[in-house]
């Protein structure tokens, strides 16, 4: 974290929503290694029922999950007045869904497997931080 202010970075909570536990844990490990606080959820409904909505600085969510999809979550949050930056990750990329997510304000749309640098760049953009070298 040479170019990052640890106190500023660690105060940002990033919520990770994915029905695949191994993906959640991998993303959570990467984000924690960057100094961010994280909260992980197995579904969009679990996130919506949590007390983390108001203190989440960025959401990283799977696109396709049982119950509410990532796009459904984005719609619900926007309808409720929450403009939390969102980054979508998916094993099933679709140009139509990508366009919809980005048009609605998503900061990234990554296909699984994605490289860590791409995810970090999306997080930095979402949090308006400089991208590390």
Language-model-detected regions and their locations in the chain:
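Non-catalytic signal-transmission and effector/linker regions of two-component phosphorelay proteins
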Residues: 1-15, 21-28, 117-133
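Acidic, metal-coordinating helix/loop segments flanking the phosphotransfer/catalytic sites
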Residues: 40-58
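Acidic catalytic/metal-coordinating carboxylates
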Residues: 42-43, 69-72
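Active-site residues of response regulator receiver
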Residues: 62, 90
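Receiver (REC) domain active-site loop signature in two-component systems and cognate sites
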Residues: 65
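Short, conserved "switch-loop" micro-motifs in signal-transduction and mechanochemical regulators
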Residues: 80, 91-95
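A Lys-centered signature of the CheY-like receiver
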Residues: 112
């Amino acid at each position: 974290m040479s170019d990052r202010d640890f106190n500023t970075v660690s105060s940002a909570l990033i919520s990770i929503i994915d029905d695949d536990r191994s993906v959640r844990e991998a993303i959570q490990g990467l984000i924690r290694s960057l100094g961010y606080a994280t909260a992980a959820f197995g579904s969009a409904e679990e996130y919506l029922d949590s007390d983390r909505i108001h203190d989440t600085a960025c959401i990283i969510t799977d696109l396709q999950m049982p119950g509410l999809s990532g796009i459904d979550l984005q719609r619900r949050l926007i309808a409720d007045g929450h403009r939390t930056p969102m980054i979508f990750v998916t094993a099933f990329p679709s140009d139509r869904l990508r366009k919809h997510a980005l048009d609605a304000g998503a900061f990234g749309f990554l296909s699984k497997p994605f490289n860590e640098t791409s995810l970090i760049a999306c997080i930095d953009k979402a949090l308006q931080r400089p991208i590390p070298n």
